[in-house]
Amino acid sequence: MMNTNELFDQTAVNSSQDKPLNPPFAVAQPANIARGKFRSLTLINWNGFFARTFDFDELVTTLSGGNGAGKSTTMAGFVTALIPDLTLLNFRNTTEAGSTSSSRDKGLYGKLKAGVCYAVLETVNSRAQRIITGVRLQQIAGRDKKVDIRPFSLQNVPMADSVISLFTEQVANKARVLSLNDLKEKFEETAVTFKPYHSITDYHSFMFDLGILPKRLRSSSDRNKFYKLIEASLYGGISSVITKSLRDYLLPENSGVRQAFQDMEAALRENRMTLEAIKVTQSDRDMFKHLITEATQYVSADYMRNANERRGNVVSALAQRRTWYDTKAKLLVEEQRLIEFSREVADINLTEQSLESEYNVANDHLNLVMNALRHQEKIIRYQDEVDALNEKLEQQQIALEEVSEQVEDAQAHTDEIDDRVDGLRSQIADYQQALDAQQTRALQYQQAITALQKAQQLCALPHLDLDNLKDYQTEFEAQAQDITDHVFELEQRLSISDMTKTQFEKAYQLVCKVSGEIDRSQAWSEATQLLATFPDQKMQAAQAVALRQKLADLEQRLHQQQKVQRLIAEFNQQAAKKLTDFTALENHFEQQQIKLEDLEAELANVIELRSVHRQQQEQLTQQYNQLAKTAPAWHTARSVLTRLEEQCAEQFENSQAIMHCMQEMLRKEREATLERDELARTEAALASQISQLSQADGAEDIRLNQLAERLGGVLLSELYDDVSLQDAPYFSALYGEARHAIVVRDLTSVKAQLEKLTDCPNDLYLIEGDPTAFDDTVFSAEELYDSVIVKVSNRQWRYSKFPEVPLFGRAAREKHLITLKTERDDIAEQHAESAFNVQKYQRLHQHLSQFVGTHLNIAFQPDPEMLMQEIALERQEIEGQLNQAVENEHYLRQQADHLKAELQMLNKILPLANTLADETVMERFEECREQLQSAEENELFVRQFGQYLTQLAPIATSLQTDPSKFEQLEHDYQQAKSTQRILQQKVFALSDVMQRRLHFNYSEENQCEGSALTEQLRTDLALAQQEREQARQRLRQAQAQFTQYNQVLISLRSAYDAKYQMLQELMQEIDDLGVRGDSAAEECARLRRDELQQQLSQQRARKGYLDKQLGIIEAEIDNLNRLLRKTERDYQTQRELVVQAKASWCLVQKLSRNSDVEKRLNRRELAYQSAEELRSISDKALGALRTAVADNEYLRDSLRASEDSRKPENKVAFFIAVYQHLRERIRQDIIRTDDPIDAIEQMEIELSRLINELTSREKKLAISAESVANILRKTIQREQNRILQLNQGLQNIAFGQVKGVRLVVNIRDTHSILLNALSDQHEQHKDLFESQKLSFSEALAMLYKRVNPHIELGQRMPQTIGEELLDYRNYLDLEVETLRGADGWMRAESSALSTGEAIGTGMSILLMVVQSWEEESRRMRAKDILPCRLLFLDEAARLDAMSINTLFELCERLDMQLLIAAPENISPEHGTTYKLVRKILANQEYVHVVGLKGFGQQMNKST
């Protein structure tokens, strides 16, 4: 933020920065500074110019040549090196005709050759530094015809090195163009500084700093202005682009003033926003305090209630568990008593269950025996049927085999006859085909040969022929006879073996049924062994019934003995003894009776001690309750005391420390108040000094500005406002007290006005002089080392030393202002801190006073909770002793009950102790059980396999010989028959050959002999067919008989399988029953069942009597069980509550500790209130909170979620949310803490201080409408004077009929009305400028609309319009006028001027712009540098000779360079002229250049 004086100071600074230094005012500018000049332009690898340097004349350089000679290319290279921005470059004379837009390459692509190209400018600045700047250009392949441009610069290049040699190197007899990387490597180790630029802004900044450009081109907008100026210069005429925006070109932007106003408005806006925020904070302070107080009450009350409930639940759970354990102990005692009474019932139940199970077993056994008897009858019946079917099956099998053999014989005989019939048929067919004798003989011969080959093949005799045929036939017939005899023998043996096979198979099957599958060779030995052991097994099976009766008797006796042993073992286990005999048991019984009497006496003493402990417990409880009543007040006092200790950063041990701290706070408050007042005075003094130094014209007294305006003069400080910081001490000492003088043109004219002045300084200095051409020749002065001697007159000298802190000139004032503002900011910060300390000490003293009046008498008492803890420990110790007494009582009672139980058990054991004498019962029982097990196994074996062994005995001898050889015999028989068949075939083949023996010697026979043979064959065929039919009939009969026998066999086999399967199932069932099925077993089982039934009836009668006696005891046990379940259920329920509360409490603790709010919630003073009281506090706070957070959705939702009593952690989350909400809402620039409670405390301290400070600051920041009008008018006046001075340089310009050019600047009528309203009528518009809702810019816009109601502002925002109205350029209209002929001064327009006149007028305007830019940028450039001035002019032939001379004269007078292009030499006697001619040599195009130095210039110099 800044005050009004700071606004004017900033305004003056910025306006003075923008104010150009006119030559008459340039006090510190040396006269011998040479202007920078462009020395040459070098084009490398351009179209027509491989390496060409154009040296520029100091004034005018002319490029002469015909169309296409390269003039435009040369100028394009210059412009490209000057402004390497492809977005701006556009060379018109190479664009497409009739196109609405320029070509893609902007006219640059076609001017370059492939490869690396350079456009380089060589410049010598005012410091005589040689500077080389340029661009590297390179065509980019593609249809877009783009060009890549990279700017660079070279410094410290020796004057002797040519530019071309820098960018090329010689390779043999050719030159190579170097790339940028090559250039960098070339100059890397030399003194030459090579620097490429990646930004056009950096490139232009370099050129501006070294005096190549007249203006710093900071942005693309500045580059656009400069390019438009160059373009207008290049193509000549009056550029509409420039004339329409002359204000942008000639009037500097007074951004400092506008920015100052914007900063001021921002400061005012921020100040007002801060005030509003303070008011909102002040209004919300009570709400914040109310919110945090109610939230603390709401959450802490529930927090402490949950803590108390959790503690109560834990105590209740422990009590429930104690009750549960007590009930369980009582139940154990009652159950122990029940055990003694119920053991007898248990024994009876056990006996009854045993008898009942035995009775059920006996009944089931009887049923099994009867079922087995019925199964045995079925087995016998099915066994007979199976045997009969088996015999029939064997007989049918034998008959079937015989019929099968008959079928096979008939089939073989039929096949043989079929073969013979087929052979006869083939012979007949052959004989019929051979009708003549030769054919018949040949056929017979062939058949004979075939028969011989068949015999050779069949008999395996390859050497068989007619000679040995008879021998072989005889031999094979003998073999056939032998094999026939052998077959007959085998048939006889096979029929005999078939009879023995049936008996062996039956005996073998019986053995397998008894012993399982065994080898056939072992069947005889297995059968012998089974038949040998079978009589003994039958005898042992008969003894099973007697053994069962004996085993039952032994089992009953063994059970009685085991019962006594079990009772003794149980007694020994309970009593931890090892008593086994009757004497030891009797002695132990007497000892236990004596011990029981002693325990009863000790129990009486323990009961008396328990009553004493209970009295002491009641006394301690009363003391504890008394302390609990005083604890809340003590905790409240200690909480307040802790808060005070944190605020005071001290520890209070007693009440004297509190009183001492109060006195200390009073002392600190007085000291801080004195310091605050002193800093306020220092800050005010610095602000006043800054305000004086911030005046726009350097006047220490604001009245001087009004006087200067009234007297029509200018303040001397304003004339010297641009003096440098180095010259400031000299001029300050030179003028002394007169440095605040007013410079007027005529003192005599001012003298009359002096007498009328009423409000002016005591000493007013007036100096006569021209304000537009004032210098320091008023005084005769002599400068010494650090002082100056001023000769006021011949008799009066003034000696003045240079001031240590000069204040003459804007630069000196700005430097001192920086120091003063820094000091003022430090003082302001210290003042704010002191004011805060004053408020803090006041608040601390107030809090201490309240504490003394409320809590001092109780805060330093001993901690009640510590005393309560001591009492609790003592009470806990007494409770432990009381519990110990109760436990001792319970233990003694248990011991007594235990002794009683032991005595009761001994009463049951002693009558039965004599049964322990018999020690052989167990051995006899095991022996009898083993005998019975063996007898039952034999009985089962006999029952299952006795019938099989009975059938096996008669035929067992057949197992001695194995009929399996029958199969081998049958195999030999089949093999012999096969051999017989083969031999018969061989014999038949040899017989056939023997019959055809004559055919081998066959000769021709007559026809009748062939016919007789055919008839013989047909007769044989008919006989063979008849025999074949008979054989087939016999085969069909045999097959029908075989089918019939086979069906009978299948039916017999199915019946056998069904009967046998049923037999096996019955045998399996009787095996599963495991009993013997005979009449003796049935009678024995029936007797056993009746006996057990009688015993069971006696036991049940006894049991009914005992159950009536146990009813009372069981009812008591049930009552105790119900009580135990109830207490256990209550304990589990209470424990679940504790566990759930613990989980929730842990989450609450975690949230509160992680968020550092536990100390806020753990209010110990609330721990002593009841749950209803705490709930009431929480409910009241909840109602208040609902109203407080009704407008905050987040807090409202959090509060609603916290109302769930099942989740207390939500309340802590709500408290944390409130903390976070307050932490975010409280201004961190005002409050110096993150804790909302501490922030509210600091807010109380800070609010009043900030309100006073910001209110006073707003008064300082208030912007005066009259001051704004004065600033705008002064700025407008200064710029008007500058434009008038620029017009002086255009007085002698003449082009054709144009005899003069000037700039006319006027104030717009609407804006003039606005200025008048601001300065003279500001009282009428207070409603705008004093409104808190409008900024100054908005108020200014509203005033503009009010005083100009006829103007339509459109939809623009008032803020935007107001910002434009703060720019003085919008108040001015700037036009160019020309003096032409009889028309006088008229507005310069191209339509009213000839081409030459327009070119000259446009050039004059451009010169004014360039000069204006130089003056505007003078303060941003070094003082020893004057920038280069160069303009272009293409097609200059349109100017006449007088206009050309005018241009040359203008260039000479303004020290400017001009580059002209024309088809002809327009003025060869002036400047330097280059003749350009484009030629083609050896298919290479190049531009021939001839330079001519102006001879007229040389003659003038010589003369």
Swiss-Prot record:
Regions annotated as coiled coil: 370-495, 536-616, 662-697, 865-1173, 1238-1293
Compositionally skewed regions (Polar residues) per UniProt: 1-19
Residues covered by region (Disordered): 1-21
A GO molecular-function annotation: ATP binding
Paired cysteines (S-S): none
One GO process term, biological-process aspect: chromosome condensation
UniProtKB keywords: ATP-binding, Cell cycle, Cell division, Chromosome partition, Coiled coil, Cytoplasm, DNA condensation, DNA-binding, Nucleotide-binding
Gene Ontology cellular-component annotations: cytoplasm; nucleoid
Region annotation (Flexible hinge) ranges: 696-813
Pfam (any one): MukB
Protein localization: Cytoplasm, Nucleoid
Residues that hold ATP according to the record: G65, G66, N67, G68, A69, G70, K71, S72
InterPro entries cross-referenced by the UniProt entry: MukB, MukB/SMC, MukB_hinge, MukB_hinge_sf, MukB_N_dom, P-loop_NTPase
Domain statement: The hinge domain, which separates the large intramolecular coiled coil regions, allows the homodimerization, forming a V-shaped homodimer.
PANTHER family linked to this entry: CHROMOSOME PARTITION PROTEIN MUKB, DUF4476 DOMAIN-CONTAINING PROTEIN
Similarity comment text for this entry: Belongs to the SMC family. MukB subfamily.
UniProt xrefs under HAMAP family: MukB (MF_01800)
Function: Plays a central role in chromosome condensation, segregation and cell cycle progression. Functions as a homodimer, which is essential for chromosome partition. Involved in negative DNA supercoiling in vivo, and by this means organize and compact chromosomes. May achieve or facilitate chromosome segregation by condensation DNA from both sides of a centrally located replisome during cell division.
Subunit-structure text: Homodimerization via its hinge domain. Binds to DNA via its C-terminal region. Interacts, and probably forms a ternary complex, with MukE and MukF via its C-terminal region. The complex formation is stimulated by calcium or magnesium. Interacts with tubulin-related protein FtsZ.
Protein name from the UniProt record: Chromosome partition protein MukB
Species of provenance: Haemophilus ducreyi (strain 35000HP / ATCC 700724)
Organism lineage string: Bacteria, Pseudomonadati, Pseudomonadota, Gammaproteobacteria, Pasteurellales
Gene: mukB
